[in-house]
């Protein structure tokens, strides 16, 4: 579940943000942006077909909305308040009405144009902290889940007997990333694009100055009030042709996700082409004399060993990073992983590369609030100006000292110039190298096939040479 326990950064920003007149102005500006895009007819607004006119205000309003939905009381308790009394309100799937994509569609604004808010999201160069944006993205995803949920039998005033958790980030594709300003508001908008029995796929956009800067596909899961079992969600029924097309694309993604997991080189035996790549890499570093036992390993020119291309850190999470179940919320994990990955990419590139994509972010286990976090970012593949990273998050229980892997992320960065090639020196590293190569190919495919609003009959190809 997303972070809904944070305190506002400044009392002045809170007063300004929560003023109804400011919220009205925000929504009015969003409508102007949409009208502008419609008049341009350039297909830049992929989500126009799902507009519902609903505006949730600012991201602080979103936080308060989630708190009100789940009946969250202020204060930290080592044992969260029992919600077992809400189990009797848990509906059956048949009692939940069907919902369309417009029902869950909403917009919210991250008001970076206000100075007190901006300070939280800016780095020392005056640029936007991408890790902070990932926190807001995760929070907004939970809000969309609440928007989709409709329980006709729930009495008025009773908290929603649900918990929503991040299950998977299929992809976060960044565009116009070098033009994101820390002095302009960022708009988040999105909707549910597919549902299972207790799972939902969400499509979310981040926009600034009427331009899309990121598109995310996220999988969320619903749990009951006590987080002891899955909970059913409203079935999604497309309301028109555009929603039907989006729904069909989501079904295809779901099939690909299942197939991708079963074909990963980290889970199954390498293919013949993978083995050929292993052999070619071996020859590059060992030479042709394979009979020499004590032959020194040779590093080709302008290359670097994978074993030397990583950065790691240990963190102690605190209650301020928790969700209502006293687990570390997914947004904090995403922010931390993105920031450590950026450091690893910077050191390898010798500059400040720009993030291009995050994909296949797995959430294996929840992180307890008393956990120590070990985050390690490995450079596993490079191609010209691109750097592919594998970032692993491990939890170390503060009591038992048992270490478990909780998250795995795959990130792509682009440097200003050509970077050193990274090469593996062990079998495990070679598997990571092949997997990184496959992830980079998936990123290229994502960039090469990105499509926009069908009505415009245009396809934007932003793959870079």
Walk through the language-model features, giving the residues of each.
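Catalytic strand-loop segment that frames the active site of acyl-thioester-processing enzymes
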Residues: 43-129, 243-330, 448-465
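C-terminal, well-structured subdomains that either form a transmembrane helix-short loop-helix hairpin
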Residues: 324, 332-337, 341, 353-385
């Amino acid at each position: 579940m997303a972070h809904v326990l944070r305190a506002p950064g400044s009392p002045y920003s809170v007063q300004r943000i929560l003023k109804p007149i400011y919220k009205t102005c925000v929504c009015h500006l969003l409508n102007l942006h949409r009208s502008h895009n419609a008049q341009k007819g350039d297909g830049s607004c992929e989500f126009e077909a799902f507009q519902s006119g609903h505006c949730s205000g600012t991201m602080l309003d979103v936080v308060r909305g989630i708190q009100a939905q789940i009946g969250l009381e202020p204060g930290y308790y080592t044992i969260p308040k029992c919600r077992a009394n809400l189990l009797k309100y848990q509906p059956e799937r048949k009692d939940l009405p069907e919902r369309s994509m417009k029902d869950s569609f909403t917009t919210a604004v991250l008001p970076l144009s206000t100075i007190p808010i901006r300070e939280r999201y800016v780095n020392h160069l005056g640029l936007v902290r991408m890790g902070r944006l990932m926190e807001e993205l995760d929070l907004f995803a939970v809000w969309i889940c609440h928007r989709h949920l409709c329980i006709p039998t729930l009495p008025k005033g009773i908290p929603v007997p649900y918990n929503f958790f991040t299950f998977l980030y299929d992809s976060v594709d960044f565009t116009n990333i070098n033009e994101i300003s820390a002095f302009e508001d960022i708009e988040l908008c999105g909707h549910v694009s597919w549902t299972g029995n207790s799972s939902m796929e969400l499509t979310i956009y981040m926009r600034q100055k009427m331009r899309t800067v990121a598109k995310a596909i996220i999988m969320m899961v619903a749990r009951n009030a006590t987080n002891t079992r899955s909970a059913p969600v409203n079935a999604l029924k497309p309301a028109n042709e555009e929603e039907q097309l989006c729904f069909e694309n989501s079904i295809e993604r779901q099939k690909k996700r299942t197939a991708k997991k079963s074909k990963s080189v980290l889970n199954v035996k390498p293919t013949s082409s993978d083995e050929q790549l292993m052999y070619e890499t071996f020859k590059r570093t060992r030479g042709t004399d394979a009979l020499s036992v004590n032959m020194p390993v040779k590093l080709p020119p302008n290359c670097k060993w994978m074993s030397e291309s990583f950065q790691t850190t240990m963190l102690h999470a605190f209650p301020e990073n928790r969700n209502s179940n006293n687990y570390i919320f997914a947004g904090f994990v995403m922010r931390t992983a993105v920031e450590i990955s950026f450091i690893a990419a910077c050191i390898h590139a010798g500059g400040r590369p720009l993030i291009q994509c995050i994909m296949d972010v797995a959430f294996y286990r929840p992180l307890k609030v008393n956990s120590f976090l070990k985050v390690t970012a490995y450079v596993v593949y490079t191609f010209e100006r691109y750097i592919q990273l594998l970032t692993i998050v491990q939890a170390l229980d503060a009591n038992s000292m048992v270490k478990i892997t909780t998250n795995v992320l795959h990130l792509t960065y682009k440097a200003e110039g050509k970077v050193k090639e990274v090469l593996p020196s062990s079998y495990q590293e070679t598997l990571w190298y092949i997997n990184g190569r496959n992830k980079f190919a998936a990123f290229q495919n994502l960039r090469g096939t990105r499509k926009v609003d069908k009505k415009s009959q245009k396809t934007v190809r932003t793959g870079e040479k």
